[in-house]
């Protein structure tokens, strides 16, 4: 029998009108019950879900009454990706583990990528799951030992 954790309670979305060069950003209070129960810290990656839509965002936290309890403010990139209205309910939680990072770690240690590993990396990049650090690791891994013909077929 596998135990399923209950999803975190929903928060009300507030449009922040923050333009962050296409970077999805979420702003939450440091005393937010979701931050505490989920163990979310500043500069964490979070997954924001609104119905069938989701976006991975960078979390910043504030010690201010700028946001009410139970609210999360979103940048324009996050707002557009979710296609929501002011006050709509969203769920904020940890993003899923990136299995494709195992391929990058193997590549850093001199092993070649399989077609499946490269496809998983590309899929995660296209879906916006890679942070700048993840992208830098991929570029470093492929620059130190360039991709060979078999890896790019």
Named regions from a protein language model:
Residues 1-109:
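Long, compositionally biased stretches
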Residues 96-153:
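Acidic, glycine/proline-rich low-complexity segments that act as flexible tails and inter-domain linkers
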